[in-house]
């Protein structure tokens, strides 16, 4: 997917044995020599900016034959804010107060598009995902007893960045 939470990524590949390999990215050029099996890696030493970073890799074999590969890597080092609320059908008291008479409430909110979410409430942990627009909705499959229930919502985006929110719902 070429998305990473590291702004100094390591590029790896395979080419002709002992070929000279250059990587151009972020206005800098990095070089290395492939090993006897053709394996190589280059660590970008200067931090790349957030967002899309095009790159070019060129390999030149000892016989002069060369090849070029172009691509891009997306740097995403920042976790996006997450929101959580009770759905309008579950929010039976004053809107937004997280007090409800619904024992299997539906939570909804926003996170980064495609983020993996984990809701921990009581001794249960549930995993689900945000859609392509970053919206998510989850209905508890098990009834909550009357009282205050603490929850933790964790979102992990595709680059591995983590956002966490905590709160409580009262039944």
Report each predicted region and the residues it spans.
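Structural beta-strand segments of beta-rich domains
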Residues: 7-11, 103-107
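Surface-exposed, short loops/turns at beta-strand junctions within beta-sandwich domains
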Residues: 44-52, 140-148
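Short, solvent-exposed loop/edge segments of extracellular or virion-exposed proteins
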Residues: 1-4, 80-100
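Short strand-edge motifs at loop-to-beta-strand transitions and within beta-strands
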Residues: 38-42, 134-138
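Short proline/glycine-enriched turn/loop motifs at strand-loop junctions of beta-rich domains
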Residues: 14-20, 110-116
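Flexible, low-complexity linkers/stalks enriched in Thr/Pro that connect modular domains
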Residues: 67-87, 91, 157, 163-171
């Amino acid at each position: 997917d070429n998305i990473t939470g590291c702004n100094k990524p390591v590029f790896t590949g395979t080419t002709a044995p002992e070929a000279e390999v250059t990587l151009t990215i972020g206005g800098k050029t990095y070089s290395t020599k492939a090993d006897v099996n053709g394996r190589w890696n280059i660590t970008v030493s200067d931090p790349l900016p957030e967002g899309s970073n095009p790159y070019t890799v060129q390999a030149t074999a000892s016989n002069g034959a060369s090849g070029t590969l172009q691509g891009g890597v997306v740097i995403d080092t920042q976790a996006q804010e997450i929101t959580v609320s009770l759905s309008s059908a579950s929010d039976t008291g004053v809107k937004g107060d997280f007090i409800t008479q619904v024992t299997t409430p539906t939570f909804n909110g926003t996170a980064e598009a495609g983020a993996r979410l984990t809701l921990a409430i009581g001794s249960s942990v549930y995993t689900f995902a945000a859609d392509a627009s970053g919206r998510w909705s989850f209905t508890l499959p098990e009834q909550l007893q009357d009282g205050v229930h603490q929850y933790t919502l964790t979102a992990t985006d595709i680059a591995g960045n983590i956002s966490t929110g905590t709160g409580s719902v009262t039944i």
